Amino acid sequence: MMSFTVGDVVAERDIHLTRESLVRYAGASGDFNPIHYRDDVAASVGLPGVLAHGMLTMGIASSVVVSALGDTAAITEYGVRFTKPVVVDPENGADVHVLATVGAVDETSARIDLKVTFGETTVLGKAQLRVAI
């Protein structure tokens, strides 16, 4: 298991999403809301474009930490607030940046703070994992 010091970077990664990524996630999750794959439907409800599923964004963020830790069982808590959508362009897709840093450490666990951004916009607020140590 890793040792944790407040302020240390646990992991950092950019993840590229495409419209195909959204369709694949829809199939796996069963969430076929057309705002996740049809521009016309997204526009008709006032959205700026097709949106990535919030749970996909949340899963991507946690996967960055899981890859660094190598142990999914170490994660004992995970929570986020969805603050802004990730709009996935039909041609260029969308790049989501995840930065995971140690926010706090106690005798039994470490809190990992996630900064998840799309462009200059934070898309997940209060994104934190608790990891057993």
What are these regions (language model features)?
Residues M1-V10, P90-I133:
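HotDog/MaoC-like acyl-thioester-processing domains
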Residues M1-A52:
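Catalytic strand-loop segment that frames the active site of acyl-thioester-processing enzymes
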Residues D14-H16, R81, Q128-A132:
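Generic structural detector for well-ordered beta-strands
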Residues P48, T57-L99:
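Hydrophobic beta-strand-centered segment that forms part of the acyl-chain substrate-binding groove
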Residues E12, I75-E77, K126:
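Hydrophobic residues on conserved beta-strands that form the core of alpha/beta folds
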Residues A52, A74, T108-A110:
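Short loop/turn segments at connectors of secondary-structure elements within structured domains
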Residues L51-T57, F118-T122:
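Noncatalytic linker/hinge segments flanking ATPase motor cores
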